[in-house]
Swiss-Prot record:
Keywords: Chloroplast, Plastid, Ribonucleoprotein, Ribosomal protein. The keyword Nucleotidyltransferase does not apply. The gene is rps2. InterPro entries: Ribosomal_uS2 (IPR001865), Ribosomal_uS2_bac/mit/plastid (IPR005706), Ribosomal_uS2_CS (IPR018130), Ribosomal_uS2_flav_dom_sf (IPR023591). GO terms for biological process: translation. This is Small ribosomal subunit protein uS2c. Transmembrane segments: none annotated.
Length: 226
C-alpha cells in the first residue's frame, strides 16, 4: 500500500477547502476549522480515508478488477490520463458524454467507429478522398479521440470509478450509482459524501493536491497488480 504522511498532505495543500459560504453541511465531520472564511479540512481524517481507499484499490487490483479514472477539469485532465495509463486503466479526461456508462451498447458503436477511422488514417485512406471529405473525417477522428481515447479498449463496464471533483462529475457519478459501480472520490468542502462509496476529504482544485492523492491511489493499484 502507498502511504502518505500528514506533512506531505499539508505541503500539497490538501487541507484547503472552499470559502465557507460554499460548503455542503454534510462535509461538517471532515472540517477542522475555518480561517479567513476558508474551510480547513481535517488532515488526520484525510490520511485515514486515503489509506482506506488505497487498501480497497490494492485489494480490488489483486482480484483483477478494472478501473475508470474520471476528471475533466483543467487541473486534473493531464494527471488523470497520466495516472490511468500508468496502471493500465481507463479514463475520461475531457467532457463526460451523457450515457457513457448507462448507454454502453450505443457508446461501443461510437468506439468501433473511432477504431475504423483510426484504421483509415493508418492506411492513408483519408489522402485518397476529396480534400473536403478527408478534412471532415480528420476532424471527426480528432473529436472522437478527445472524448473516447481513454476508454476505446474498455470491453465492459468498469468495476470501480475513481473521480476528481464530485460536483463537476455529477453525471458520471449518477451513472455509476445507477449501475452499482463503487466510486472513490476526492471530496472538497462543497461536495456530498453521501454520493460516493469511499470519500477522500481533500482539495480538488490544486494540482499538487490532486497529483499527490492520484499518485497514491495509482501506486496502490500497481501494488495489487504485482
Amino acid at each position: 500500500m502507498s502511504d502518505i504522511s500528514l506533512s506531505q498532505l499539508l505541503e500539497a495543500g490538501v487541507h484547503f477547502g472552499h470559502k465557507a459560504y460554499r460548503w455542503n453541511p454534510k462535509m461538517f465531520p471532515y472540517i477542522y476549522s475555518e480561517v479567513n472564511n476558508i474551510h480547513i479540512l481535517d488532515l488526520v481524517q484525510s490520511a485515514t480515508l486515503l489509506k482506506e481507499a488505497n487498501l480497497y484499490l490494492e485489494s480490488a487490483a489483486r482480484e483483477n478488477k478494472t478501473f475508470l479514472f474520471v476528471g475533466t477539469k483543467r487541473q486534473a485532465s493531464t494527471l488523470i490520463a497520466q495516472e490511468a495509463k500508468r496502471c493500465d486503466s481507463y479514463y475520461v479526461n475531457h467532457r463526460w458524454l451523457g450515457g457513457m456508462l448507462t448507454n454502453w451498447s450505443t457508446l461501443k458503436e461510437r468506439i468501433a467507429h473511432l477504431k475504423d477511422l483510426e484504421q483509415q488514417e493508418a492506411n492513408n485512406t483519408f489522402d485518397l478522398l476529396t480534400k473536403k471529405e478527408g478534412a471532415l473525417r480528420r476532424k471527426e477522428l480528432k473529436k472522437l479521440r478527445r472524448h473516447l481515447d481513454g476508454i476505446k479498449d474498455m470491453k465492459n463496464l468498469p468495476d470501480i470509478a475513481i473521480v476528481i471533483d464530485q460536483k463537476r462529475e455529477t453525471t458520471a457519478i449518477r451513472e455509476c450509482r445507477k449501475l452499482g459501480i463503487p466510486v472513490v472520490s476526492i471530496l472538497d468542502t462543497n461536495c456530498d459524501p453521501d454520493l460516493v462509496d469511499i470519500p477522500i476529504p481533500g482539495n480538488d482544485d490544486a494540482v499538487r493536491s490532486i497529483k499527490l492523492i492520484l499518485k497514491s491511489l495509482t501506486d496502490s493499484i500497481l501494488i495489487g497488480k504485482s
